[in-house]
Amino acid sequence: MTDTEMNDRRLPVGIQSFEVIRKGGYLYVDKTDIIWRLANRGKKYNYLSRPRRFGKSILVDTLRAYFEGKKELFEGLKVMELEKEWTCYPVIRLDMSCGGATPEELNSYLDDAFYKYEQKYEVAVRPEASLAVRFQNIIETMFQKTGKQAVILIDEYDSPLQHSWKTPQHDACTAIYKSVFAVLKKEDEHERFVFITGITKFTQISLFSVLNNLSNISFDAPYATICGISKQEAADNFIPEIEAMGEENGWTPEETLKQLTAFYDGYHFCSDNMVDIFNPFSLINALEDRKLRNYWASSGATSLLPKFVDDMEMKMEYFDHCFIEGDTLETSDVVNGGAELFLYQSGYLTIKGYDDGVYILGFPNFEVRKALYRVVVPALTMKSNSEVVSAQSFLRKMMQDGNTAEAKKALKALIADVPYSNKKMASMDMEERYRLIMSTIFRALGFRVEVERMLATGRIDMIVEVPSFIYVLELKLSNNGGISAAESQIKEKSYTEPFKADKRKVIALAVELDETGKGLIDWKEVDESL
């Protein structure tokens, strides 16, 4: 492909308007056959949960264009083989991510949104009319003036509820929801199709308590790929971009796709159709920049974690292979469903397997794993984020360069006094505390870490892999022999032997730790040949 042809290919970075994508000549992964089936399956009320930045808004906007009968935008897409009538319906679209986190902000957004529809359809409004009455009048007037039932699209319905959760504002926001969205059931005869997207499920609001016939398609196999990009779709639509990214980084196209898969793929949304799904936001940005970066996390994806997950820094290993009842995952309220449910709905965990009514959950990919570990390091080390970032950046560089003397200084600074001072670890023995802290720090750097690897000769405390080196760490407390005992064990058990075939240099480290929890005392490179 020539440079000119490549420049003509436009990736839709940050664009959530279907019309802009189609008229602007941006690349579009065609989901319109799935969207058509959703719109015409005979279910009036539909709900879809997907993580943030996962393509829900462009899905909603595509539905709007379809129901508004904008046939010209769909030329060349799969829906053209399916839709024959292209009926134009009146459409209400509400983007609740604009609704703020207080009742005042929520009222203001709905007031403004309803005003625009009142102006468009010339709805008579009494000054004292409530938001619920105005919503009802809009739906009825649409029907009266067009002769067509209304289509109602509510995007990111839970955003104000998430952001107000655990604040004094939450109950007032919930009351507004109950009042306004109870209208959906009252106006059933005037509605053609209602589609609601969100991340987390708050069942105490009327969307779920009143709409008892609300169809949750979040776990339905036919809609598993309605958001996101499958590996096949990536190969079908983005080969030139994959090749260009590979050329810039010295990878073959196959290696590039493998890297993208490790970083951004791995989502599954049902037990029957375990197709790997890329996070579309991260994939598109990576192809645009031709870099592997943490796009999803840097967009604010981790900001709500402290509200919904307590003591997460102590539970990371558990979350990477945890179990949850099918009924809990599919139907429970996020408020009462536990940390696993929130982490799944928010995209931090995904379905890894299913057995006898129980889902197995784990981290979907490298980007999410690294992002979560970076979030918990300040809490675990009891240091400010700025302190952690500075020390971690230096530690990463030194570990990647094989400079163990300088790496030791950075690690000392990060874990000084932590095992002693962090009372959440009181039930753990001292060596276990050090293993948790050190493995979390290394994982937050994006290194591959394995704890307590079993060999025929013994058990390696920790293995840390970086691009050019493999570090084999044996940890010993000062009152248990310290560096001398750790060095002897590495040699006697031949701990570096399993890695001799690897092209990377293997560095064995005998690590001495203070038995009272004051931190790293010293470490020493071990030469097994001596």
Q: What do these predicted regions represent?
A:
Residues 1-430, 445-447:
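Phosphate-binding site recognition
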Residues 142-146, 441-468:
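Active-site metal-binding core of divalent-cation-utilizing nuclease and nuclease-like domains
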Residues 151, 469-473, 507:
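Structural motif
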Residues 171-177, 477-496:
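Mg2+/Mn2+-dependent nuclease catalytic core
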Residues 180-187, 341-349, 439-444, 489-509:
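Metal-dependent nuclease catalytic cores in nucleic-acid-processing enzymes
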Residues 432, 436-440, 470, 488:
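Feature representing long, continuous alpha-helical segments
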Residues 438, 462-479, 493:
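Conserved catalytic cores of phosphodiester-cleaving nucleases, focusing on short active-site segments
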Residues 498, 502-530:
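Domain-level recognition of nuclease-like catalytic cores that cleave nucleotide substrates
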